[in-house]
Amino acid sequence: MSSLFVCPLCGGALTRREGSYLCPAGHCFDIAREGYTYLLPVNRKHSKTPGDDKAMAAARHAFLEKGYYAPLCEELCQLAVELTGDAPAVLDNGCGEGYYTAGIYRALCAAGKTPVMAGIDISKPILRLAAKREKNVQFAVASSYRLPAADGSVDLLINCFSPLAIEEFRRVLRPGGHFIYVVPGEMHLWEMKQVLYDHPYVNEVKETPYEGFRYVSIRHITDVIHLEDPADIQALFGMTPYCWKTPKAGVEKLCKLTQLDCRIAFDIHVFEKER
C-alpha cells in the first residue's frame, strides 16, 4: 500500500505491509491496533507524554462531534476540492482527533478524486481517536518540525491551529502545491474571553508573507454557537491557549456558567509554493 510517510531514521520511503511500515533499509514501525503508527524518534520527544492527554482528547472529540465547528470543516472541505487535482497527496499537520482530516478526505472522495492522505500529531491518545474515525487515512505520531514526508511529495498541506513549521512545509510541498493555514479570527470566542478576563483583547488579523510562498487568499468564517452543557463550555475552554494562561478568578467564573452564547471566527489563509 502506498504511503506518504518516510522513515524517520534514514529518510527512506515507507511501504505499508499488513501490520507495519517498512523502509528499504529494514527499519520497521508497527501499526497500533487502532490504526496509527509511531514515527517520532526518542530524541525528538520533549516530554514523556507530549501533546493532549487522554482526558483532553476525549473532551475535544466530544465537542467537535456535536458540530459546533462544522462551518469551518465545510469550508476546508470545499477549499481542498478546489485546490487539488485528481489524485492529490494531502497532509494534515497537527491533525488532532481527525475531525477535519476525515471530513476533507471524504469530500475529496465524494468529488471523484483518489486522495492519498495522512495526518500527524504529537499526541498518542488523540491519534487513537483519529485512526478510529477514518480508516483510509494514514496517521502517525510525529513532529511538525520534522515531518515524516519526502521533499516535494505533498500537493496540499493543512495546518489548523497547529505549530507553524514553515521551513518543513516548504520542504515537503511540491512547487505549485498549496498550504492552508487556519487561525482564530478577530472576534473568536469573544464572549468567553469577556468572562475570563477583565480586559479581553481582539485577535489581530494579518496577512503575513512567507519566503517561498505566494499569498493566494484569506477567507473569514463567522458564526454563533449556543453551549447549553457546562461540559461543552469546559471542553471548548480546554481546546484554547486560554486554559494555560487564565487567572484563577476567570476560570472560576467560567466554571459557574451553565450555558453560553459565543461567537466563533476563523481566518483561513491560502498559500501556494512558488514554482
Predicted segments with their positions:
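Class I SAM-dependent methyltransferase Rossmann-like catalytic core
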Residues: H46, G51-E75, L79
